[in-house]
Amino acid sequence: LAMLAAHPSTAHFIATKLAAKFIADAPPTAVVDEMAKTFLATNGDIKEVLLTMVMHPDFWAKAKEKEKIKSPFELAVSAIRATGTDVVAPYQVFTWSEKMGQKFYFYQAPTGFPDRASFWINTGSLLNRMNFGMAIAAQKIPGFKTNLLALNQNHEPESVEDALQTYTKLLLPVSDQKENSERIMSIVRAQ
């Protein structure tokens, strides 16, 4: 086992898996190579490998920012956290995760659900992801209580533009949403 753990292929395999989890489905080779070197130099110290990953400039590259897709459960939990939703019926998280394609305890492989965007994204799952967001905002999920006013210092946005800007900044803080906002506003104005 010690020989296997010290083999460069093991280091590369583990570095690739970690980088795929945290950076992108196809992580940058430079990051993986540095992580593998750290793995070998530290006798497999995962903490040091992860530090190498987050210290690498490619980890913070804007191009990689939008490459990771959350699993349905991760999406549900992050939406609940971002909106400050009070959950008194947690089974709804599992119900919605299942609607979005992640049925707990029913994936046959012992490795668990794949950590790849292609597994989670298709027409039906995208629609259910949007429906989940709409259901939270519209208070349509039993046992979920979202106070949208609290997200905007307890007052309603003064216009549709203000609402779009306020909630986009809150829910998508690191992305430039100008193009999407303009598209949405053109649709709203046309109605």
Please identify what each model-predicted range represents.
Residues 7, 11, 15-42, 51-191:
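Flexible, low-complexity segments enriched for small/polar residues
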Residues 1-7:
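Active-site cores of enzymes that catalyze phosphoryl transfer or operate on phosphate-rich substrates
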Residues 47-49:
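Alpha-helical scaffolds flanking conserved acidic
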